[in-house]
Amino acid sequence: MEPISHLVKSSLPNYLSSLPIPDSVGGWFKLSFKDWLALIPPTVVVAGIGYTAYLAYCPAAKAICSAKTSGRCNNLIRKNEPKVVDMIDVEDIAEKAAFCRCWKTKNWPYCDGSHGEHNKQTGDNVGPIVIKK
């Protein structure tokens, strides 16, 4: 417990008091390169705490993070069915057909190119299944 006490009571205050924080706005322009380097670690710590708080308390950030990490593929199509299955007879296909694998299409089960936007959002590389006759 003594090392933590020393850190909080002595080391951290000494470090913070030695930082080259100017008294005026004009003082920021007079800082040397070495002074700017000394300000990087506390700036990174404050930015990290801010980003962590943003992820923890901002509803928009929670929605984005949970959508990327949920593991669910189908968020839209025929959610009332336990399993989505489409049977298509190969004889009904003219020359070729592209079928969706990303579950983002509005023309299910055919691909409408929605995987392009899906790939940008998630970093995925999914494309359609192309069936040729």
Swiss-Prot record:
Main location: endoplasmic reticulum
Any one of the GO BP annotations: regulation of autophagy
Alphabetic keyword roster: 2Fe-2S, Endoplasmic reticulum, Iron, Iron-sulfur, Membrane, Metal-binding, Transmembrane, Transmembrane helix
Spans within the Lumenal topological domain: 1-35
Membrane topology (Cytoplasmic): 59-133
Pfam families (alphabetical): MitoNEET_N (PF10660), zf-CDGSH (PF09360)
Molecular functions (GO terms): 2 iron, 2 sulfur cluster binding; metal ion binding
Membrane-spanning residues: 36-58
Compartments (UniProt record): Endoplasmic reticulum membrane
InterPro entries, per the entry: CISD1/2 (IPR045131), FeS-contain_CDGSH-typ (IPR018967), FeS-contain_mitoNEET_N (IPR019610), MitoNEET_CISD (IPR042216)
GO terms for cellular component: endoplasmic reticulum membrane; mitochondrial outer membrane
Keyword Membrane among UniProt keywords: yes
Cofactor(s) essential for the protein: [2Fe-2S] cluster
Binding site for [2Fe-2S] cluster: C100, C102, C111, H115
Membrane topology summary: Single-pass membrane protein
Domain of life the protein comes from: Eukaryota
Cofactor note as given: Binds 1 [2Fe-2S] cluster.
Similarity section: Belongs to the CISD protein family. CISD2 subfamily.
Protein name per the record: CDGSH iron-sulfur domain-containing protein 2 homolog
Native organism: Drosophila yakuba (Fruit fly)
